[in-house]
């Protein structure tokens, strides 16, 4: 049967292909039992043998200009200052200026000889461990809200599970004492919680937010990890609450939201033993913190996120999303490209390169899919 979809459209509709990770879970009896009292976060084998065991998603909110970062356009440089040589796309009605070449030089890096702009010299030095995809064409979504939803869920229009939710649903979590999907400093705008939500999947698979785009990450906290009650008293309270909730479920029927709430209480209880240590990046050596850029400007905030991301991955978190997000951190540069991108690149370049090198040194990079992406580039 001819579906009328080409390969690229299929990948787009499955949230950049991540939906395939969950196929084994979707077809299995254990996954069908997730909403009826199974163990939804138990680790599961993928449908096909896989190299990657976990995902690190570095999301740059606002739209990094591809032609000023990792996708040089020699013809654009040659035509700098000339009028647009073709009709403007119909979906864009804003005034259009003449062609603008990148103000940054591109250099060849590594044995692979991949070109990277002067904005990212540290990442450039890691280029032999990077696959640069220059052929991707996301969609005709020109507003940040729909574009964010599109890259995070596969649809800018309809409610869909996020990448992390699909991954966790399909593969489960390696550590039952920590959330399987964590989003660091996500924006509360442009789709907000939908960008790390579970949509029609059981709510257990939604992401756990640490911080947000409006708050400096050094002030981000996971609440209720150090309660006043003893573990024994907490256990009694949770067991009582669980029995009452389960009685309600038996009387009223399945309720995904309530089941997720029960699971979240249990997760919060288990997290008290492990999460405080994971969150405490001061346990890292001074040399490691310096390598990431912790304690120095302008790298401190994103360095903290990247270092915590590595600690989470190392502890068995399946999917970690690190967000450079609105409104405090934003790549949107309508009229001030040079200052915007120079400033933002200086904040993320060193931390990302340090994270890649750290993962490689620890033997984690070989089995971690690291994705660096943005919702769209510049035209």
Language-model segments: what does each one mean?
Residues 1-379:
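Ligand-binding pockets and gating/stacking loops
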